[in-house]
Amino acid sequence: MQKFWSKTISVSEAVELAVKILKESIELKAIDIPIDRSIKMISSESIKCPIDLPPYNNSAVDGYAVRSIDTIGATQLNPVKLRVKCSMDTGDPPDKCGVLRDSEAVEVGTGAPLPEGADAVVMYEDSLKVGDYIEVFRQIAPFDNVNRAGDDFKAGEEAISEGTQLTVFHIGLLASLGLKNVRVYRPLKALILPTGSELVEPGELLQLGKKYSSTDYIVASLLREAGFIKVIKLSPTPDHVEEVKKALLKGLEKADLAITIGGSSIGSRDVVHRVIDSEGLWVFRGVALRPGRTTSLGLINRKPVFILSGNPVAAWAGFTAIIKPSIYKLYRSSPPVEPSIVATVSERIVNVAGYRSYVRVALSSNGLKYFVKPYMIHGSSYLSSIIKAHGYVVIPEEVEGYDVGEEVVVQLFTTRHLHVA
């Protein structure tokens, strides 16, 4: 029997088709939420600054606000003498000390507003307090030691563009602008359905011939890691067409899309494709991806159903290469950039012509640079091939591999792996 992935499409084609289907079947809606609940959500609109940041000129140091023109010619041997008329600190109104006039100074703390007339700040280190006066030992230029209004962001400037995934710093910016709420796209609802008569939930008694369901937990965690996806995870369903169909149809009533785990081939016990055959239609069946070539996409009741392998590494590759970028494109965004390093190949990394390969790799270092070699090329069912690997290398379809001595980009599974022996 010929397997359906003998006519696979490229990863790029799969992503393009998936994005098209997602856009046709899922309506993006905007919601307003408090900024302190918006971490990793996707901005649904361009946000303009309503005010300058900082909102007023303020001191960048502790010292004295002055008119820079009054310090012309100041040196250690020929200091300029200025009268200290007042002091200001953070939170004081800018008019507290009135207008700064000729040969006057105002003592200021870091962050304090500059009084009208002042255009620079003399640091304590460049002055000496003598009674009600200071001696200034250095000539300073206009706006020295001053945070100018609008230096950070100007009123009317775009602070956050549509499709931005909000980070802790974006939330800080929104708070600095006085915005209590932010408009974001509503979370996506994703159904996860693991299939397999051999699967039992973690915590249950493990009988001979059974194994704990784990790939569904990996995919659920990958979805939750995105931050803007609500996961509906079902318990494992046996390899019976009617049971899989029932679980899938009922689950899709509350979800925007589904991801099935396992049953992605056409063996006698791989029933997911039969459910798509009977209840929906295929968008693509199989992708030129290693591991993960059985990754597929169908439609049931106009809702996308992604099919991933039950093997954890193949499921991870299918999710990373196809599902993740497709969902981000739906949200007019792009996935966060993963940490990476450049390393020199110490053992040839091979590829199958026409396939995009996600090769798990191990790193080593001589103290000057990093070296990389394949780690467990085969074994997409082995979690150790990811747990014990330092990262992975993506080999494009048109590249047959990387030879010893070539430099490649290694995507790191975690930055703690940067320090290797």
Description of each model-found segment:
Residues 2-12, 180-308, 312-322:
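Helix-rich terminal scaffold detector
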Residues 7-74, 166:
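Intrinsically disordered, low-complexity, positively charged segments
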Residues 8, 12-15, 26, 31, ...:
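Flexible glycine/proline-rich
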Residues 9-13, 30-33, 61, 115, ...:
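Conserved active-site and cofactor/substrate-binding residues in soluble primary-metabolism enzymes
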Residues 18-26, 46, 114, 157-164, ...:
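Structural signal for hydrophobic packing residues in well-ordered secondary-structure cores
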